[in-house]
Amino acid sequence: MNNYFTIHKLFTAKKNLLFLLSFILPGLIFFSYFFYTKNGVLTVDLGQQYVDFLAFFRNNLFSHPLRLIYSFSNGLGGSMLATDAYYLFSPFNLLLFLFPENLLPQAILIIIGLKIATSGLTSYYYWQQKINMPFYALSASSAYALSGYVIANHFNLMWLDSVILLPLLINEIDRTLRQEKSHLILITFLLWFTNFYTAFMTLAFGFLYLLTQIFFFNRKKQWSIFKSYLIKSILGSFLDAFMLLPVFIEMLQGKAASSANWSWGFQFIPYNQITKLADGAYNFHEMQEGMPNIFIPLPFLLLTILYFLNKKINWKTTLANGLLLLFLIASLFWTPLVLLWHLGQFPVWYPGRFSFVLIFLALNLAIIALNQQEKIKLWQVLPLAIVALGLILFVTFNDQSFDFLNENAQIATGAFLALGLLFIAFIYNKNNYAAIFFYLIIELELVINLVLSLGNLAYQKNYDYQNFVKNTTQVTNYETNHDQSLYRTEKNFYRSDDDPFSANYYGLSNFNSISNQHVLSLLNNLGFVNNSNSYTNFGGTPITDDLFGIKYYILPNEEITPLKEKKQMKYDNKNQRIDVGDYHLQKRFNQLILMKNNYALPLLFLSPTSTKKMKFDPSNITKNQTQFLQAATGNTTLFHNVIWPDPKKINVSSWDGGWMQYSKKRKNKSARLIFNLRPKTNSSYYLELPGDIDDNAIDMYVNGSFVNLTVRDSNTRLINLGSRQSGQRIQIAITLKKDNLDLNAANLWRLDTKKLAQEMHSFKQIQPQITQPSALVIKSNHFSLHKKMTMKSTIPSSINWLVIDNGKILHKNKVLFANAFLSFNLNPGKHQITLIYIPWILIIGLLISLITLVIYIKINKSISVSVNMEK
């Protein structure tokens, strides 16, 4: 008996050790790369978007939880529910609270590493049930956790929860197929809850997997299994209604509102996908415009092929799995299937976001092949050798077409294909240490692939983010402590479009996959640089500052003594807004200056004009801004056209009969145009540039200072040339980058800032004071009207806003102010306005979730009662 317990303890200890290894090793390999390279983890969207959302989550979950429902940090103001559901609802994010704010980048790295480690654990849990040799399961779990998909998308950390849960989903489907008790409801709930986007892909694969397996049962059993699967999947989904319903509505209003162009063609030449099987098949171009990442260790690739050469496996099972595999492969490049997997939208960057399910299936087939313990014959090795040779030749002869196929990648690919063949032909099933040998070569290849892949990327320095947050938060905290009204803040530089989330202020800029299309359209018409899911403060004027309620501006403090690199704040992406220097100096900080715009309107303001639908011309920004101003205040035109001065031409000639159209004389030499403008007033001067004149067409300097002309979409925009420079020279120097330059649609404008200040001063005198007592409530003070007026706002319209005047509900105007914002009419008399944001769809979703929970509990009770009665 003692021997039995000793053996049992040893077996249990070994089993636990293997589970521990499946968790520790993938995470350790990932962490080691960043430890030895001393890289920060912030790069691309993680550094420019997700880190800001995570900072917002950390700052508000326990202190201001209602901000996770609605926030004015979200662009000009918007619901946060879909953003929460997409980016923030992973339970791993709670680990952020274990770290101080200044260690947020390091905390994110730990979260990513733990997610990778956990995906190794869950996949090992699944595969160790499928094979008698645990080291093969351990190899597969590491291959899954550090696959090409995970390495390429490690910074898209919100997708990794689905990678973790996929093996558990398939495990529960297997239990359903065996008609055993399963936790399919729980796994379905967790998938939707952690990230609805990749949850759709995971659950779609689970459904396809079920179909391939259920095919072999008799009709009666098929229906019984399918019914059980369907009921549990529906219950799990309806439990998430509190989240899925708001997401669905917001997606209809946001990203999904734009339609994709369906076609029957391919996204790229299908056979080029073969290159993504090579080691290190990843770089920045692949991230942006490349092909889906499908790398698995090459010995596993050969074993996946071996699965289809195995005679022990039933041919019907082989056929079903083969069809599923082909379907997933076709989904990588065939347009209809690409759109199907990505919810009807082409992925912007990061192609093939579902490819982790293909990787899982391939590894699963390889594990099945390994578990057959079949004696490998020559006729099976030959096709594998041909595939290996073909892959090596394809990679070698296409190295000039794909930057990632460098010499190291080619050597690694050839070496591990050779090791894979060596293992299958001479070691597998012939040596007691075959599984350990296989495990070691898999881990080695995973390390090499990780180093080659991530070595092609550039990462931001952690201290750049930390310096930004430390300094800007110092300023915004000062604002909050000294000004209790509701206002917006902006900067003439930015670290990311989502700076308001990290620095805790209400701004204008925003980068979000789910954007308000009405707001986006308005900002485009007003000249702000934007694309389909982001917009910045670049392109604004004192008119837009006043109307949008931008009361404070944060500027660099240029007068300080330069600090050490790790302490010096970077003023990246500077906005050419010279005129913000005319605002009132509020306070100097260590590295920043706070300016106050005394003419900024409150976010709710009284207007003498009624709300009418506005027609904007995207190519005429000054007209649009004038129209915006007139609709708000009723004021007159303040923009005046300025005649272009004659340019000094260097290696440039004018077109015959043309106006402001130029060509290079000698194409191989530098060509420049220099315009010298001498203002006769202290007004603010602007250059209106059409969208096709960007940093690819010209370089531009104003009084020797470089002007950033980068656009996102082809946006016409205004560039501030100078302010309060009467009698002084403003020099515009343009260097041609192409042979021809057409400035026919470019215009010079003068904004009468003195008159604007006078009119806004008078207009502001009649405005009520607006405060925000809580995240979902906005209040005015008591005020009186002698005539009927319209209360307009720069708060994006939503059905969720309830307007109350002295305790009575008011009807909102159906016609939106500036085609985007909330407005309502007020009669003469005394008023106190209260706006309450009530998330109706969230409430309906919560009711559905609660009803589903009650139904689930009752079903469970009735099942328990019937089981007890049978006993």
Label the model's feature ranges.
Residues 1-33, 436-438, 854-871:
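Start-transfer (signal-anchor) and selected internal transmembrane alpha helices
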Residues 52-55, 225-228, 239-310, 315-316, ...:
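Periplasmic/ER-lumenal interhelical loops and adjacent helix-loop junctions
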Residues 23-26, 113-130, 135-216, 228-248, ...:
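Membrane-embedded helix bundles of polyisoprenyl
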Residues 81-86, 105-116, 143-167, 177-178, ...:
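Membrane-interface micro-motifs in multi-pass membrane enzymes
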Residues 53, 636, 640-871:
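Active-site-proximal, structured, solvent-exposed surfaces of multi-pass membrane proteins
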Residues 23-123, 142-163, 244, 251-256, ...:
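Membrane-interface coil-to-helix junctions
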Residues 198, 345, 349-471, 830-871:
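Contiguous transmembrane helix-bundle modules in multi-pass membrane proteins
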Residues 444-461, 481-550, 762, 798, ...:
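Extracytoplasmic/lumenal acceptor-recognition loop(s) of multi-pass membrane glycoenzymes
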